[in-house]
Amino acid sequence: MLLALLLLMTACSTEKKSEPQLWCDQPLRPELAQLEEVPVDSKWFKVYRVGEGVYAILEPYNFQEVISYLIIGENKALLFDTGMGLEPISPTINQLTDLPVMVVNSHSHYDHIGGNYEFDNVIARNTLAMKERVRQGVAHDQVRGEVTPEAICLDYLTNPDTAGYAIKPFKTSYYFNEMSDFLLPLGGRDIQVLFVPGHSPDGIALYDEDNGYLWTGDTFYEAPIWLFDKGTNLVAYRKSIEVLAALSAKVDKVFPAHNLPVSSPERLNELVTAFDQVVSGEKEAVKTGDNAEVSKFEFEHFSFVIRSQLLEGFQNQ
């Protein structure tokens, strides 16, 4: 996954200090100090209360800085993603709620499904990519870059196992297809599922209309947005970000899946404008060394890392 280049891109973004050699050298993001932290019995996870009945569960000691979300209803709780699988997440979830927990994933990439195996009630997109993860997980050789000193601070793991790290297979309660008006009722609050392919074929976002909350998965976050995987589709991505931007006037808080757990709804409109500047050729790529496989386009609050071949295909259609 071009890991060395991506680590450099992450390091050189405005969100972190310049060019880290070891992830342990990186401080926590200063913006986190403005949020309400919830104490938990875990060194690996940092938990913040970010909305009414909403907890952000961060993994800041791996360079992915992935964020899972626990959404509390009256009758059940919804866990949106389960993280890297580097440390069991269920003990932390059990400290936050006694309600039955249902898991749904923003998409099938390994950094969002790592803890799925810990839960009995996982509902999943009915896609080939997700079904492959269910059956096989992800082998160590595909994720070993996540446990190098450049990518992780092992000091915070209970039982570090760099040689054995892999994403485990998991069981699902049922698969769901793309449909309109798909709601996840939690008791006292209904969460709408939005289908937002592009970053991956099976991407979803969640929308809590009553509270004005929008969870964007990897379709948007304030950092380098990766658009280079074999399942990335730029045409679909453009349509998906327009769907999210159309909700910006109704949304009070945006909850992305990486780096910082709270973003402003106005960023969604900026996202569409920025992407259009990229594909039109108005925005020039910044230099990323000698690697021509990907191009990086920087904006004030985020950037795009796009496989050059995909971008050329989009521009030439």
Show where each model-derived region lies.
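Conserved beta-strand hairpin/beta-sheet module of binuclear metal-dependent hydrolase folds
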Residues: D41-Q95, A205-Y221
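Metallo-beta-lactamase
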Residues: L32-W44, Y48-G51, A77, M84-G85, T127-L194, S200, ...
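Accessory terminal helices/loops
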Residues: E15-E37, E242-Q317
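Active-site HxH/HxHxD metal-binding segment of metal-dependent hydrolases
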Residues: L86-P185, E222, R267, L271-E284
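C-terminal motif of bacterial Sec signal peptides marking the signal peptidase cleavage site
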Residues: M9-A11
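Sec-dependent signal peptide recognition
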Residues: M1-L5
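Active-site-proximal beta-strand/loop segments in catalytic clefts of secreted hydrolases
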Residues: P60, T82-G83, S106-H109, R125, ...
